[in-house]
Amino acid sequence: MARREFGKGARRCRRCGDTHGVIQKYGIMLCRQCFREVAEKMGFKKYN
């Protein structure tokens, strides 16, 4: 099977491999669920 080059399937989460809800901004490349788990370790602050 050929590697995907375009579309949502081409971008995968670095942590779990999911293709849904991937955050690409600033080169994060994590799905939103994984991002919520590791955001504080990455230096993001959580506000109310």
Curated annotation (Swiss-Prot):
InterPro entries: Ribosomal_uS14 (IPR001209), Ribosomal_uS14_arc (IPR023676), Ribosomal_uS14_CS (IPR018271), RIbosomal_uS14_euk_arc (IPR039744), Ribosomal_uS14_sf (IPR043140). Keywords: Metal-binding, Ribonucleoprotein, Ribosomal protein, RNA-binding, rRNA-binding, Zinc. One of its GO terms (molecular function) is zinc ion binding. Gene3D superfamilies: 30s Ribosomal Protein S14, Chain N (4.10.830.10). Signal peptide: none annotated. One of its GO terms (biological process) is cytoplasmic translation. Zn(2+) binds at residues 13, 16, 31, 34. The keyword Hydrolase does not apply. One of its GO terms (cellular component) is cytosolic small ribosomal subunit. PROSITE patterns: RIBOSOMAL_S14 (PS00527). Its cofactor is Zn(2+). The keyword Electron transport does not apply. Binds 1 zinc ion per subunit. It comes from the Archaea. NCBIfam families: PRK05766.1. Part of the 30S ribosomal subunit. PANTHER family: 40S RIBOSOMAL PROTEIN S29. Belongs to the universal ribosomal protein uS14 family. Zinc-binding uS14 subfamily. Binds 16S rRNA, required for the assembly of 30S particles. This is Small ribosomal subunit protein uS14. It comes from Methanopyrus kandleri (strain AV19 / DSM 6324 / JCM 9639 / NBRC 100938).
